[in-house]
Amino acid sequence: MGSRNSSSAGTGSGDPSEGLPRRGAGLRRSEEEEEEDEDVDLAQVLAYLLRRGQVRLVQGGGAANLQLIQALSDSEEEHDSAWDGRLGDRYNPPVDATPDTRELECSEIKTQVELATGRLGLRRAARELSFPQMLHQRERGLCHQGSFSLGERSRVMSHFLPNDLGFTDTYSQKAFCGIYSKDGQIFMSACQDQTIRLYDCRYGRFRKFKSIKARDVGWSVLDVAFTPDGNHFLYSSWSDYIHICNIYGEGDTHTALDLRPDERRFAVFSIAVSSDGREVLGGANDGCLYVFDREQNRRTLQIESHEDDVNAVAFADVSSQILFSGGDDAICKVWDRRTMREDDPKPVGALAGHQDGITFIDSKGDARYLISNSKDQTIKLWDIRRFSSREGMEASRQAATQQNWDYRWQQVPKKAWRKLKLPGDSSLMTYRGHGVLHTLIRCRFSPTHSTGQQFIYSGCSTGKVVVYDLLSGHVVKKLTTHKACVRDVSWHPFEEKIVSSSWDGNLRLWQYRQAEYFQDDMPESEEHPSTPAPMSHPSTAFSSPQ
């Protein structure tokens, strides 16, 4: 019970068996739909499942009567294991050319973003000023008090989105997680090789200063989080424990927080830490939310929250009183920590509109707005003051139940490309243009300080980082070079830098680089004045071996 300390190395269990398509998946499908939607070598998939122990063949009444049955295994959304078909590489996610912004136009978040980016009250021509035009206005004294306001600075930074690869670190296995600390001084990366790497990001650097071997890891580290004081980090895996470890000091002290689950095979897919560092929140494959109190050194809550795996959890703001959860039932639920009880597990409300399982949730940090990524290949923006009706919840549940494809190794069905809004969908906005395959891909709001949270960015199964304009829904940037899906993305809280963590084993830092120089700015002796001059990246000097 409670926690345990460990200073000795341990590797944990190996790769657990995978499940077949999710519980409750639809079983019927017409031959016409099969031919239209399937682009998979079924023999290859069957051989893979047999090799992995997912299914087995048994003889029926006759010698030629063979039956395929599922091996006893929990359904699990996070396991690709040795499947390297990389079907996502062949999938080109359709981009929504005309996003529906009607709900967003009437919402308060539109005013918030316009205020944070210095566009509130401006005419359209003034909103679309180029950077040189903004500088000219400042020189003429037309800016507030002769200088750019905070909103105008955020608008200026929108002209300098990351567009160039500045640093790469390569691992021997898949990179699963990668996040900046709250102050941006540390970047933490978690890889399938059971190693957590910490990078020093102070003064423009990106230099690895510590590698820590994770304990009690089954298959891979699935999620990581920093403590609010920045002195420790937490990680979860296929294990009954969430571990906490020190960042600084000699040696590594791993403390295991025992969640005491009822399931034999147990995994925590998502973790979050309260603002005071006291409580640790986890979402697990048994459909439950777990709360561990670090002061009492015990699990204090086990809430039956979703009908299937809980893939995402997040606190709404710094008060840590309101929290969000999302699962494979396609429902996002809102909870009040002060009223959560094991004997009466009722959320204060629910948000419905997705047609398949939710893979990640990110809060805007104001206890009002959040975004969710989903296997239905969309991101949705929500306002928790607009809960869904029973009709909407039932429509989402039914849509998720009728899904009869497995996102881990199958192509996206063409019917999932349709721009369809379910009855009772209470979302403010839907973003399309990225792929969600193979794993629980993350999406996040861009930082407040540098961008005014005017962007939403996401990983992609096709190896891209996709950046959306929050208000218009259009894709404004795609960062490409990864050879496999990008599972996690993290934007520096104060600088124009994005780090992508990919299943191709690469960690990549993206930053802004001027693509072209005007001829007047080039030396007269230059042979090719229109050719971009080479630019050295200080961070590349810190490229570290694994």
UniProtKB/Swiss-Prot annotation:
Designated gene of the protein: DCAF11
Residue ranges with Polar residues bias: 1-10, 537-546
Ranges for the WD repeats: 170-210, 216-258, 263-302, 305-345, 353-392, 435-480, 481-520
Modified residues (Phosphoserine): S73, S75
Protein name: DDB1- and CUL4-associated factor 11
Role this protein plays: May function as a substrate receptor for CUL4-DDB1 E3 ubiquitin-protein ligase complex.
InterPro entries (UniProt xref): DCAF, DCAF11/LEC14B, G-protein_beta_WD-40_rep, WD40/YVTN_repeat-like_dom_sf, WD40_repeat_dom_sf, WD40_rpt
This protein's record includes keyword Metal-binding: no
Compositional bias annotation for Basic and acidic residues: 80-89
Pathway where it operates: Protein modification; protein ubiquitination
Matching Pfam families: WD40
Disulfide bond entries: none
GO cellular component, one term: Cul4-RING E3 ubiquitin ligase complex
Region (Disordered): 1-40, 79-100, 521-546
Biological process according to GO: proteasome-mediated ubiquitin-dependent protein catabolic process; protein ubiquitination
Swiss-Prot/TrEMBL keywords: Phosphoprotein, Repeat, Ubl conjugation pathway, WD repeat
Self-association and partners: Interacts with DDB1 and CUL4A.
